[in-house]
Each structure stands twice: as C-alpha cells, then as structure tokens.
Amino acid sequence: MYAVLTAIIAYLIGCINNAYIFTKYTRNIDIRNYGSGNAGATNVLRVLGYKAAAPVFALDVLKGVIAVLIGKYLMGNTGAMIAGIAVVCGHNWPVFLKFRGGKGIATSVGVVMTVSPLLGLIALAIGVTVIVLTKYVSLGSITGSVTFVLLNAIFWNSTQIFIFSLILASLAIFQHRSNIKRLLAGTESKLGQKTEIK
C-alpha cells in the first residue's frame, strides 16, 4: 500500500513540468513547439538561453530531491528508490500534458544525489566533463547515467540499488533514442546552438 502511495505522490510531483510552466507564463509559448520539442531544461536553454534554463533546471532537480525525501520518509531506502523512478516517469510522461514531457536528466540528478550522493556526484562530474569537452548535452547525459550504473556495479552496495540505477539509466537512454540516432548521423545540436523564436 505504501509503495503504491509513494509511487503516485512521486509521479504527480514529476508531472509538475517546470519548462512548460516557466515558458508559458514568461513568454506565452509552449516550449514543446520549439527546438527539440522536449519540455525540459536543455530545450529551454536551446530556445531561450541560460537565464531561462537555470531556474527550470534547478526546479527539476529540486522535485527529484523532494520526491525521494518523501519516499524515504514513507518507506525508507526502498521508498526513496521507488519515488526516484516514479518522479522521473512523471517528468517524462506527465499526465497533465498528455504524456509529453522532458527527458528526465535534471530530475534524475536530484534523485541520484539524494539516494547515493557520492556515486551520484562522480557520475554527474563525468557527465558534465563530457558535455564540456564535446558540447553534446545528450552524450553527457547518457554517459552520466551509464556511469552511475557502472559505479554501482563496481562499488556494490545492494542488488536493489543496482537495479534502481539500471532502471534510471534505461529511462534516460530510451528518452534519448532520437538523440542517439542524430549523434551517430553527426546531426545532433551542440551546446550553444540556439533556436530563435519569431
């Protein structure tokens, strides 16, 4: 019962789409109609720049943190992981936006930094390094997600947290499947390339 309650609460928190809300009320646009069509911080960055993307990213991270803390309060570490997966699913497929959300990376950052701070920080640092070196946000996001899985395999804590990391990485890779195709084709947008709003 608590597991279901935890998942529902976390999912609904994830459904609060900060990219959509911020751009709708500050620029009167639906961010999903611009750039990559993704309702997330990276697309806000691409379309509106750093000043708009920063609060969206921060709020997306925060909702991951809040969901995990609620899950931990209700069910301990198991609840934290259930909530972590559910909040990312809510971000990716929000019921209030007809299941068209973001890719879950910023929210995943909040989740892993709360569930496993040290390994989360290492994975984040590696992901950011890849972004800085290549200018591909998608590549850095995927790398960071996979790194978190590998770190959990190397510094084994429990089967539960390894499966948790594997699910999070799978969600990230699935949401970036179109980016992977563009990366392979050499057509993926780099950090700094901006889409103008007419």
Swiss-Prot record:
Membrane-crossing ranges are 2-22, 48-70, 75-97, 111-131, 154-174
Cite the record's note on assembly: Probably interacts with PlsX.
| Gene Ontology biological-process annotations | phospholipid biosynthetic process
Q: Does the keyword Cytoplasm apply?
A: no
Q: In which pathway does it act?
A: Lipid metabolism; phospholipid metabolism
Q: Which Pfam families match?
A: G3P_acyltransf (PF02660)
Task: Name the chain's protein.
Answer: Glycerol-3-phosphate acyltransferase
Query: Localized where?
Result: Cell membrane
GO MF terms listed in the record are: acyl-phosphate glycerol-3-phosphate acyltransferase activity
Quote the EC number: 2.3.1.275
Q: What class of enzyme is it?
A: transferase
The UniProt catalytic activity note for this protein reads: an acyl phosphate + sn-glycerol 3-phosphate = a 1-acyl-sn-glycero-3-phosphate + phosphate
Family to which the UniProt record says this protein belongs: Belongs to the PlsY family.
Q: Keywords on this record?
A: Cell membrane, Lipid biosynthesis, Lipid metabolism, Membrane, Phospholipid biosynthesis, Phospholipid metabolism, Transferase, Transmembrane, Transmembrane helix
Q: Which SMART domains match?
A: G3P_acyltransf (SM01207)
Could you state one GO cellular component term attached to this entry? plasma membrane
Q: Membrane topology for this entry?
A: Multi-pass membrane protein
Cited function: Catalyzes the transfer of an acyl group from acyl-phosphate (acyl-PO(4)) to glycerol-3-phosphate (G3P) to form lysophosphatidic acid (LPA). This enzyme utilizes acyl-phosphate as fatty acyl donor, but not acyl-CoA or acyl-ACP.
Kindly give the InterPro entries that the UniProt entry links to this protein: G3P_acylTferase_PlsY
